[in-house]
Amino acid sequence: NRREDVWCERVYSPWHDLDKVMREQQIPLFALESQDPIKDFDFLGITIQFEMCYTNILQILDLSQIPLHAKDRTLDDPFVIGGGPCTYNPEPIAEFFDLFYIGEGETAYDELLDAYKEWKGSGKSRREFLERAAQIEGLYVPLFYDAAYNEDGTLKSFTPNNEYAPATVKKQIVMDVTDAPYPMKPVVPFIKVTQDRVVLEIQRGCIRG
């Protein structure tokens, strides 16, 4: 929120009890700060830390009343962006996302937001914005690529089908983390911690990533 023209809020995947109540009372998933429905935002960014969280992605989209598949979304829906460690292998969940940050998103935030502001008032299509986003280094737009697979499910080929999509999407790295933002007071769930363990972050990122 360092930009005066952008307001970023938080949202989390509800636990089973709240999920049940929200569905029964038809309450759409909403932001923590404003309580505005997620479906009314311009973007929905989802951090994907582990493969076991993939079902949470569908839960968030479903509770938000956002079409699950990117191809079914319209100008009335937010752009869904994936980020985090699992985006290094995005294909298993590619059809649910409009965009992926490959690597660290801080390097592309400003350019993407500026492109969105320019597009928003232009009257252009959703696809045209994605074409502009595909030109930003580090952004992967699944719509603009054709993936073919071997019989064992491994990736056989990966080919752009749009003139604006690069043949290779280069991961982005923040080389100097001295001034990189870090959440000092993260929201934590009021539930029993998995395996009764403590997670202590001693560095940014993964030494094998």
Predicted segments, located by residue:
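N-terminal [4Fe-4S]-dependent radical SAM core
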Residues: 142, 148-199
